[in-house]
Amino acid sequence: MAHTFDEKTTAQLNRAKEHFEQMFGKADRYLAVHAPGRSEIAGNHTDHEGGHVIAGALDVAIDAICAPNNLGVIRVASVGYDPFEVDYTNLEPTEAEYLSTKAIVRGMAANLVKLGFEPSGFDMAVVSNVPGGGGLSSSAAFEAAAGRAMEALWEGGSEISAVKLAQMSQNTENVYFGKPCGLMDQLAVCLGGLAFMNFEDPAEPQAEKLDLNFEDYGYALCLVDVGCDHVAFTDEYAAVPVEMQKVAAAFGKTRLSEVPVEDFQARVNELREDLGDRALLRAIHYWYENDLVDKRWADLQNSDIESFITLTNASGASSGMYLQNVSTSGSYQPAMLALGLAESILKGSGAVRIHGGGFGGSIQCFVPLALVETFIAQMNQWFGEGACRHYAISDQGACAQWL
């Protein structure tokens, strides 16, 4: 399928080509690769429980230029980072590579080889304006970009669907990158646009897209990097699905989507004694938030933005009170402080919520357009220049195109 890149993407691809030729020399032919960042619009920690999510690809992306090198290795040079090589004759995961881009390349190579692709050497020059560690899924974007590059450059395999690419990327994130995650991040990156996702069947997640930009309804989608990489709280993040799934296991199930809330309510006292209160609170959040996702999707379909805003605030409160992925132990509370300060500017208008995994990363704010300049300036004063940015939904998912 032919892809048309917008002016912003084309400019970033041109930078990637310059970097390619600086690092590797000129090539006979170039492959352009694009993978957007993403924003979780609704559904905080619902995906790993087989629940529902609304997510949107954003107008920030990882863009890369690739070409075969006939050297038997994959060479990657990202602007601002040290270059590295991956020997694709060794595709085993290793803890020494956890949380590294090298692990992502190795993991995606392993997944494509399993599909029947024949690996070969290539060079990849990367430019990104997706903030790393800020909750916009920079790792998922890199996974999807690497996967689309290998799909186009390697022989022997068949076309990879967006869902399959997302599942391969999730495997890479979990097994090679060493970070637990649901499927939402990767599927949003691979699909593009604004999409409702149903993860009840993990083998065949369902997705429905909607052509919508929040600016058309009077709101700016803003994300605030709170200045704390959520990688620092990987253990806290990992505890969320573990505790939710302990509740499910008490009913002989693997995920909360398989447990009727009425069955849970009938056994609260017993479950408190066996699992502790926090696991129950997180389960309560799942059912409440999943219902809010469905209601917010209906609101967006019906252009009822004010109801969407009201329910988004309810979602944010649930994350803080029940899911408990905003505050961390001790006096260092960057995400909660960001939410409180954002509320102090909005004064009851718009909506604020924790964004993505939580425990740092970023917060999400729907800001009335009349306030957006003031809001961004004030949040940047508190959290640093560039911490608060106004984003738009991008319809382009992860793709590759020969130039």
What are these regions (language model features)?
Residues 1-31, 36-52, 88-92, 97-216, ...:
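Gly/Ser-rich oxyanion-binding loop with an adjacent helix/lid
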Residues 52-70, 191:
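Structural signature of FAD isoalloxazine-binding scaffolds in flavoprotein oxidoreductases
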